[in-house]
A protein has these predicted regions:
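Short internal beta-strands
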Residues: 38-45, 137-139
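N-proximal low-complexity "stem/linker" segments adjacent to membrane-targeting elements
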Residues: 1-30
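GT-A fold catalytic core of metal-dependent nucleotide-sugar glycosyltransferases
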Residues: 75, 91-146, 166, 173-174
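Active-site-proximal specificity loops/subdomain of glycosyltransferases
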Residues: 56-100
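A recurrent flexible, glycine/aromatic-enriched loop bordering the glycosyltransferase active site
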Residues: 159-171
Length: 323
């Protein structure tokens, strides 16, 4: 990727997630100062105060870029299933509209979830050759037997060939030209309407099923999922993925680093670093006090039993040296 090339970044948020979005964007700008960055934030609507805060990110530290807010309103989302107890909202499906919402002269964009920290340059990732593919993303599995089995279960449920693979939709490089030419957005909504019972993982299932073999898999360092370090996973880690410094850290577990009562957490130091650097340095999460207290007590019980909410082993210690 040439330095003068604009890097187009897309994310989505509501008022509740604005702090996470802002902290993620701070880490993005801080680690990619050599490029002009245009950020497009998809939202159903946020307060004027939050709108101003997000817009001020680029001005505060003289970052080289701009932030646009794209209001999403589309009746097709009425057909997108959100079940009782799901930990996502209909906003998970907003990424279906990225090629329509972004200016038509933009041919490539990188989508990032908000529970992410950018820990290095995205230049090589953004320069990925996208010839004849729609999306470049990281495999949901990490090459070990457990996550490979889970991915195969997803593929079997969706009913497509295993060789097409299954990716995580938290980080996606999008070929918008291909997407528009092949009318992928129409195919995605049509699939959801016909197969809502199959889409256990919402937009991620839909994207994997519809895109078929038009996906390209990228190194795991571009979507390093902290779920690897949760209790019980210590024997599942594939040593291969620990050989490179994580560039994008994805905090994709139920327990998050911004839940202040945890003494430690994989890559919490990075998240705290960018929180303190951001306009949300005093933010400590949205959970009400009763819920915070409940989680503190659970953590204390684990400690009393000689256990940790998050496990640490030699693999984790190796990674901390690459932080």
């Amino acid at each position: 990727m040439k330095k003068e090339e604009t890097m187009n970044i897309v994310c989505s948020t509501d008022d509740n997630y604005v702090p996470l979005c802002g902290i993620m964007l701070t880490s993005l700008f801080e680690n990619n100062k050599g490029h002009y960055i245009s950020v497009y934030i998809l939202t159903e609507g946020i307060s004027s105060q939050n709108r101003s805060l997000l817009k001020n990110i680029t001005q505060r530290r003289d970052y080289n870029g701009e932030i646009h807010l794209c209001v999403v309103k589309d009746n097709r989302f009425n057909y997108c299933p959100i079940r009782s107890g799901d930990h996502v909202s209909v906003a998970a499906y907003y990424r279906f509209l990225i090629p329509e919402l972004l200016p038509q002269n933009i041919d490539k964009a990188l989508y990032l979830d908000c529970d992410i920290i950018v820990n290095g340059s995205l230049s090589d990732l953004y320069g990925t050759d996208m010839s004849n593919v729609c999306i470049a993303a990281c495999a949901e599995h990490t090459g070990d037997s457990y996550t490979l089995r889970v991915s195969e279960e997803n593929i079997n449920r969706l009913g497509y060939p295993k060789e097409w693979g299954y990716f995580n939709s938290g980080v996606m490089l999008l070929n918008l030209t291909y997407w528009r030419q092949k009318k992928v957005t129409d195919d995605l909504f049509a699939y959801v309407m016909r197969n809502h019972d199959k889409c256990l993982f919402h937009d991620q299932d839909t994207l994997n099923a519809v895109l078929g073999n038009k996906k390209k898999f990228i190194p795991y360092k571009y979507n390093f999922m902290t779920v690897l370090f949760t209790d019980g996973n210590e024997k599942r880690i594939n040593p291969v993925i620990l050989q490179e410094r994580p560039i994008i850290i994805h905090y994709c577990t139920a327990v998050k680093p911004w839940e202040w009562y945890l003494v430690d957490y994989p890559f919490k130091k990075q998240w705290e670093h960018y929180r303190k650097m951001s306009l949300w340095k005093k933010w400590r999460g949205n959970k009400p006090w009763p819920e915070r207290l409940k989680r503190v007590l659970i953590a204390l019980l684990y400690k009393m039993k000689g256990k940790d909410v998050i496990f640490y082993d030699k693999s984790w210690k190796r990674l901390t040296k690459m932080e």
